[in-house]
Amino acid sequence: MTRKNTATNPWAKFHGPNLGYVIEQYDRYMTNEGSVDPELQELFETFGAPTFQVDVVTGDNKETNFSPQSTGNIETILKAVQVVENIRSFGHLSAHINPMEEPHDGQSLIETMMRELNDVDLKAIPAKTVWPDAPNDVHTALDAIHRLKDVYTKSLAYEFSHIQDSEERTWLHQMVESNSLRQPLSNQKRTALLKRLTAVEGFEQFLHKTFVGQKRFSIEGVDMLVPVLDEMIAEGAKAGVEDVMIGMAHRGRLSVLAHVLEKPYSHMFAEFKHATIQSDDKTNHNAGWTGDVKYHLGREQVVGNETVRTRVTLANNPSHLEFVNPVVEGYARAAQENRKKAGYPEQDSSKSFVILVHGDAAFPGQGIVSETLNLSRLNAYQTGGTIHIIANNTIGFTTDSYDSRSTRYSSDLAKGFDIPIVHVNADDPEACLAAANLAIQYRLRFKKDILIDLIGYRRYGHNEMDDPAVTQPQVYKKIKNHPTVRAIYAEQLKAEGVLSSDEVETITQFTQEQLKAEYAQVPPADTSEAAIHVKVPDVVARGIQPIDTGLPLETLRAINEGLLSWPEGFNVYPKVKKILERRRTALDADGKVEWALAESLAFASILQEGTPIRLTGQDSQRGTFAQRHIVLHDTETNETYSPLHRLPNINASFSVHNSPLSEAAVVGFEYGYNVFAPETLVMWEAQYGDFANTAQALFDQYVSSGRAKWGQKSGLVLLLPHGYEGQGPEHSSARPERFLQLAAENNWTVANLTSAAQYFHILRRQASILGTEAVRPLVIMTPKSLLRHPLTASTGSELSEGCFQPALEQEKLGTKPTKVKRLIFTTGKMAIDLAAEIESGKHEYNLDELHIVRIEQLYPFPAEKVQSIIKRFKNLEEIIWVQEEPRNMGAWHYMAPILFELAGDKLKTGYIGRPDRSSPSGGDPHAHKAEQELIIAHALDTNYNFRQDKQEIEVYSN
């Protein structure tokens, strides 16, 4: 017997599918009490039939029993509930989100179930049974289904079902179902929106007619991108956001520059005419000496009104699609962090946010996209949520979507990262603004990524010289006859009585007059020598001047004591503790400082001088080779501690993070961070230098050339473990030849060091130039086996005195200048191998006839110092370059012309090393050892004459 208890109502928490399930179980219970779960059986016995909380007709709150006896058909309720869920989950398949196509999929999922229901039955079911949040004017299940179809299957469509967090999912559904996003716009705002669209279209058409055939990568077809960005920036500014960072490719970029970032039309036109026009002092992000095409340039601009303003930054961008994404994320993280205190920086993600504008072909096609998405929830890289916009013109150059992705939507990749997706028809301006509003509100509330798929078309070809009808003839017949979004919206406003035809025409004429007036300000093309051949700035051409980077020994000892201290009760791993304790006497008179300690001393001293540090890499906290131990782990609690957070007299942050297994996205992020935080020593460390080449696009397009193209300064440090130790082709070479090939115009420093002191000094030198015009990136081929090698360890006095030396001479050689016949130039580990062989005394060499110079700084080459060394040896006969890399790799092809010039006509110049190879290294450690020994023997044997050696070692002479 059922005993109904009216004191409480446990059914209040059940609604939608859950309520349907409970009703179904109650039906089974009434047939057979033992057929349901014991817990449900107890509920039914105690509280009776499930109830709902609404009156069918009035919508008033009123508890009503809902049992099989009162409904007559449980299946009808369950089917109605399922229809509602299908609308939410699959409504996007029926939505009209592509302006060039009618919806043709998805109807079956909803309509099939609807055919099993009839209107009479649906009208008998209260709306709140199937839709608990139904507004009061929605009374029945039939009303609910019609209303929800309006929400989910029109110009806006949503994909939320994959969101794992129920709170987020509920909020998203409530936002779109409450219609708060689609509140009617005021006539004033609708008129302003039409004016904006008129400006965008007018600008593009003016360019099309005035600069015929010039590339501009028109926005036409997704014109609403500009108002969408406007809306997001305005709403962000109202919420107190100080910085909005935008990354986008070239499609639509000129219109975004002109309208969102307020770059004057006259400046845009001047770039088309190759004219020089007075700067507005807000284009500092693209003032390089080689320059770049107009649709790659960025800009920074403060926008808003007198009461609410925010800084908007559009990042400079190459044509390597999507590689700007992690760079802009780095901008945002730098803008969010306070680096003026010891410890990790304090992050406030409400200070800035990122908008990334993607292409529909590039978003699923470029791996850097997923690498960057993976950063979004990681402690070291998250920026509190990014708003993604796919400017979806449904084509990639000439490639249709069915040839460019394996999924229905270009946005599908985002589902794997728990990102809500909003599809919107780019021909429905007000729907686009609703999507923008939802995106910014979601980001501000949940601090997570969200994506808008802005679906339009491309009115012209990939560029304006391309005829798209050659490859997409049918589509472009449609597009040719398709009205623009401005025309569509103008007709809508006229039809609704918001504007008259004359008022619409006045708006159009105003735009045209404004464009003509701006064009009239542009002078003729500037063909002067100064305009065509812009010189490298003197401060760059001069290079880095010598800087005293030594520190008093007492200061170093005090720092070292702090580095070897940890909180009382902190349990350091015994093996690590032993390693650290060995460092305690390193600065004594008879002690030696190994590489890792020199690094820690440099870091600590840099922090004490007020420079923040950020170090990331796949194993950077411990160090790939278990050398660094800059973050300690308590063996009992797993808590972490970094001594660099507790040293005295530090007022700058130190952040060290283990990165995800990514090179490209992480390098891009660190580069962007450094550009936006130029006072910070930002360092990226490869696990092995061999893996750095997966970030090659970042090295090529940003790190090496960003300043020349855009005037974008960076002091990023790349730490690339390099050295041949018989570990095979994937763990030997950071490919220094590639960094040297990119070296020009003093764009960066490339170093391959041979002592801990040199590492100490070059880090301190790099820190000293941050935030100055002399700054440039630093690329270091860091050691592996040499980290603990006695010949790379340094005395305390070598750290306390002097500065970084771009070239070093081998001690105890060259002491009899008149006898020296052979001068060896080498770098990095090869120099230590030669020194170790000499010190071992295993073989007899005529060392009086030999001298060795270590080139510590490969670029810029220390020519003056090397020339002074050569001049000392009056009887010199030959200059030799010795390396362990194959001849077509390493530094030889960079060094050869330098050495030939230094040698002149009187000296022979030669190469000793491995022959040309397609792979950096062999895989057999025994063969490696034999080759290495042969290189060393030939180099140190001054009687060895130049020839092609039969034992796989290349010896070459001019």
From Swiss-Prot:
Named cofactor requirement(s): thiamine diphosphate
Domain of life: Bacteria
Protein known as: 2-oxoglutarate dehydrogenase E1 component
General function of this protein: E1 component of the 2-oxoglutarate dehydrogenase (OGDH) complex which catalyzes the decarboxylation of 2-oxoglutarate, the first step in the conversion of 2-oxoglutarate to succinyl-CoA and CO(2).
A cellular-component GO term for this protein: cytosol
One GO BP: tricarboxylic acid cycle
Pfam families: E1_dh, OxoGdeHyase_C, Transket_pyr
